[in-house]
Amino acid sequence: MARYRHSRSRSRSRYRRRRRRRSRYRSQRRRYRRHRRSGRRRRRGRRRGYRRRYHSHRRRY
């Protein structure tokens, strides 16, 4: 685990740059979600779990 944490600090600059570019896409998706009111609560819970898994995968790269 320690080794993994060290590697992340080194590639943090690249991660930040990629994050900013993706921010626009995420905002678009959020607007679309707000439009669809039906089943928002259930979707939100499912999305949170998916997001956490996705982040862990991105970190490993």
UniProtKB/Swiss-Prot annotation:
Molecular-function annotations in GO: DNA binding
Disordered: region residues: 1-61
Family: Belongs to the protamine P1 family.
InterPro entries referenced in this protein's UniProt entry, alphabetically: Protamine_P1 (IPR000221)
Keywords: Chromosome, Developmental protein, Differentiation, DNA condensation, DNA-binding, Nucleosome core, Nucleus, Spermatogenesis
Record GO cellular component, one term: nucleosome
Role summary: Protamines substitute for histones in the chromatin of sperm during the haploid phase of spermatogenesis. They compact sperm DNA into a highly condensed, stable and inactive complex.
Name listed for the protein in its UniProt record: Sperm protamine P1
GO biological process, one term: sperm DNA condensation
Tissue specificity comment: Testis.
Superkingdom of source: Eukaryota
Key word Nucleus present: yes
Cellular localisation: Nucleus; Chromosome
